[in-house]
Amino acid sequence: LRAEFCIRAGDENYEAFPWECSLQMALILTENALECRYLVTNRDQAPMPFGIGLHPWFLLPEGTEKVRLRLPAETYFETTPDLLPTGRRLPVTEMPGHDLRRFTDVAALDLDTVFETQGRDVTLRYADRGYDLVISVTPDFLDSVVFTAFNRGMEKTGYRAFCVESQTCCTDAINLSEEGLADSGLMVLAPGGTKEGGVVYRFEMKKGGEG
């Protein structure tokens, strides 16, 4: 499945993002994986800042079945009361419930947090079902957002869902870069330039004895 989104001068979206550009997305389904590829093209005459993020939803199983998350991040971004990153990085060991380097029960988490995963794999373990869901990214995806919507308002809908979002930059990267944060992950494309990358969601059978 392929799709393309374009912004041109005069478009409504151009008022919010004043660069002529295009985003192509390709979804490639195989026997045990879904690959999501992007291609961004700057069709403008000026350099264009941008970032890419994927926002998949995952349901918590019913009953006693658990989903465990392993996220290889040593640091996360401090946030304002509005949950926007300040640009300050903190060790995950300084905040309870933020060190996810070992498999952790998702239902026990309460997060809307940007972690620095630096292109490393993130894993969801469905031990009762006998498999892992491994999220692999190209090196441009520097961050992962964990959002436990099931205890942040969404529980009123009757759905118990959470997100693990792969992002090439931290949330609000354009404003943070304007404020002087040089390593927000924001990418800048020269006129006529292109950038591509992607995320793969891959099912792997769990090895015997792993829980």
What do these predicted regions represent?
Residues L1-E31:
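Extended, loop-rich substrate-binding clefts of extracytoplasmic carbohydrate-active enzymes
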Residues Q24-A26, S184-L189:
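Beta-strand-rich interaction surfaces with strong enrichment in secreted/lumenal proteins
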Residues P47, L60-D140:
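Active-site/ligand-binding surface loops and adjacent short beta/alpha elements
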Residues D44-Q45, M205:
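Short, acidic/polar linear motifs in exposed loop/turn regions
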Residues G51-L59:
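Histidine-centered catalytic micro-motifs
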Residues D105-A182:
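Acidic/His-leaning functional-site neighborhoods
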Residues Y38-D44:
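Asparagine-centered strand-capping/turn motif at beta-strand->loop junctions
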